[in-house]
Amino acid sequence: MKLKFCGFTSIEDVTAASQLPIDAIGFIHYEKSKSHQTITQIKKLASAVPEHIDKVCVVVNPDLTTIEHVLSNTPINTIQLHGTESIDFIQEIKKKYSSIKITKALAADENIIQNINKYKGFVDLFIIDTPSVSYGGTGQTYDWTILKHIKDIPYLIAGGINSENIQTVNQLKLSHQGFDLASGIEVNGRKDIEKMTAIVNIVKGDRENE
C-alpha cells in the first residue's frame, strides 16, 4: 500500500515525515487553499525530501507557464492536477516533460467511471477525493462503496482519511493502491508525528507483516 502525505508548509514537518516509510509528499500551489505555498517555498520544502520519496505539486487548473515555473525551479517530480484540466493540456505537459509523473484527482461522484475512462490513458495515477466545489481539502469522507466498481486502475483514496476510519476502508476489499492524507495527519493545522506514525503503522506495518 502506498502513502502520500499532503499539504506541507514547514521544513520541520517535511523532515519528520521523511523519516517514515511513505511514498510521496505533497505541496499545494493554489492560492485558495489554506496550505498554499509559493514556488519559492515549495523549492525550499521539496529540497528537504529524500530522493526515494516522490515530490508532488498540487495545482488547480494551472496554465502551462505555471507548470514550467514549478518544474524549472523546484525538485518536484510529480504534478497533481486537481481541477478540470483537458487531455490536450496533459499531453502538452507530457510532451515537454516526459519524465514527470502526472496524477489526476477526481471527485467520487456519479461520473467517476466516465472520468476515469476519459483520463486513464494519459495519467500515471488517480486520486479519488470527496466531491467539493473547492477542489478537495475538505477533510470530509464519502461513501467508499462507490469505488467497488473501479478495477485495474491505479488510484489512491483521499478525503477525510484518518487512523480511525482507514481500517473500515480496507475491510471493503477495494482495489486501491493506497491513501492520500492531509487533515487526517494534522493537529491545529500542522502535521503531527504521532498521527503520521499511526497511519504508517496501520498501512505499512500490517501489509509488511502479512
Swiss-Prot record:
MF (Gene Ontology): phosphoribosylanthranilate isomerase activity
Q: Name one GO biological process term.
A: L-tryptophan biosynthetic process
Q: Which InterPro entries match?
A: Aldolase_TIM, PRAI_dom, RibuloseP-bd_barrel, TrpF_fam
Which Pfam families does the entry link to? Answer: PRAI (PF00697)
Class in the EC hierarchy, top level: isomerase
What UniProt keywords apply to this chain's record, in alphabetical order? Amino-acid biosynthesis, Aromatic amino acid biosynthesis, Isomerase, Tryptophan biosynthesis
Give, as in the UniProt entry, the pathway in which the protein acts.
Amino-acid biosynthesis; L-tryptophan biosynthesis; L-tryptophan from chorismate: step 3/5
Family, per the entry?
Belongs to the TrpF family.
**Source organism of this protein record:** Staphylococcus aureus (strain bovine RF122 / ET3-1)
**Any idea what this protein is called?**
N-(5'-phosphoribosyl)anthranilate isomerase
Nuclease is among the record's keywords: no
Q: Which reaction does it catalyse?
A: N-(5-phospho-beta-D-ribosyl)anthranilate = 1-(2-carboxyphenylamino)-1-deoxy-D-ribulose 5-phosphate
The family database entries (NCBIfam families) matched by this protein are listed as: PRK13958.1
Gene symbol here is: trpF
Q: What is its EC number?
A: 5.3.1.24
Give the matching CDD domains: PRAI
Q: Which Gene3D superfamilies match?
A: Aldolase class I
